[in-house]
Amino acid sequence: MPTINQLVRKPRKSKTKQSDSPVLNRGFNSKKKQFTNLNSPQKRGVCTRVGTMTPRKPNSALRKYARVRLSNNIEVNAYIPGIGHNLQEHSVVLVRGGRVKDLPGVRYHIVRGALDTSGVDGRRQGRSLYGTKKPKN
């Protein structure tokens, strides 16, 4: 336990918060072939592999994911939300931050209804997150 005098001389430092999705905070200058500090809310990428993964211990399912090479040349695993999808290799997708708690190594989500990703068919509630248009009736 430090004394008051020690704290006056050298105050406590607050910890710097690390990003939950660090790959979105890096750009790539292809002309200079170097990374830049470029924060972005989403990034475009190309699917290199689409598959399923089993979740951690108490849960059981086949969760859909895609391995995506982003525009800054970094590869990440991204979760495909919703029921059914049209993604395959070489599909162009939009990736946002947000981890999936029971899938190890998946820290990103694919945005449904953007670029090559279709929205979820037959979805009536919570359509905004799944890229579904308003039904005509």
Swiss-Prot record:
Chain positions covered by the region annotation Disordered: 1-57, 118-137
Keyword annotations from UniProtKB, A to Z: Methylation, Ribonucleoprotein, Ribosomal protein, RNA-binding, rRNA-binding, tRNA-binding
Keyword rRNA-binding recorded: yes
Pfam families linked to this entry: Ribosom_S12_S23
Quaternary structure and partners: Part of the 30S ribosomal subunit. Contacts proteins S8 and S17. May interact with IF1 in the 30S initiation complex.
HAMAP family in alphabetical order: Ribosomal_uS12_B (MF_00403_B)
Name of the protein: Small ribosomal subunit protein uS12
Source species: Staphylococcus epidermidis (strain ATCC 12228 / FDA PCI 1200)
